[in-house]
Every structure is written in structure tokens, then in C-alpha cells.
């Protein structure tokens, strides 16, 4: 399709970018109910009704295969690659669904990450920063010391490590 840009897009497709920079998810699950906190599709139970996810979690039709949603926003200078993961439950052993603000568990948990990549002379660009969001808390990670806490709120004093050159470890 046409983007009505002055310069026609070139380089990798958005799918290729999302695959090339896809983070490696390390996710802790509670050992009393592993499946409750799996990363899966929003419609893992065969419907898009969200208020029945706890009831449908252990039904035979539940497909708990791993799914990560993604999108790419492109400017003339950068790619912003967004990744989102869904959990039927955000689960802990001490979960009390009647106290959702006191206990860290709830139904329908969506969290995510954004990888910011600067376009350069290489095919895949250069990593700039990683932003993650979980439970309404933003964390920003970078490897360039020029990006400072004065310029970036929520900056963590931890660098980003990668698997296979371009895959940030979360």
C-alpha cells in the first residue's frame, strides 16, 4: 500500500523487524498454578469474552500455546517495535480476587515492551532503548550512557543484555 511518504520505505518489512528484534521473555510463574500465568492468546479459550477466562483456563478447549502480539511504528529516523503479552490470570499463591488492589493477581493481564531502534547504515538499525510496562509501572533500559535519568523518566541503572545479537532479554 501507499504511505503517502515523500520517500518510499525501504529495508526490512515490519514483520522482519519484529522477528529480528523480538525479546526473549523470561517469565516466572507460581508453582501452585503454572498455567494461570502462561503467556497466551487473548482468545485462548475460543472466545473473546474476557470475564470467563478463569473458568475456562483448565477446560479441554483451552489452547495455552505461547503468543506475543506486536506492531511497528516507523518514522524517518527510528523504528518503535511494540510487543504485548497476555496472561489469562496474573497469578500468585496468595491470590484473593476480592482484593485486586491488595493482592498482585487479577484476570486478563496485558503487559509489554517496546524496543526503540535507530535507523542507520545497517540493515537492522541500532538499539537505542528498551521500555517495559507491567502493573502500570514503566521501566526504561539503555546501553548508551548518553541517555540519562534527566532526559528519561523511569530509567533503570541496568543495561540491556541480548541473546543472538539483537534479542533483548526481558
Label each residue range with its predicted role.
Residues 3-113, 117-170:
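A domain-level signal for the mature, folded cores of soluble proteins
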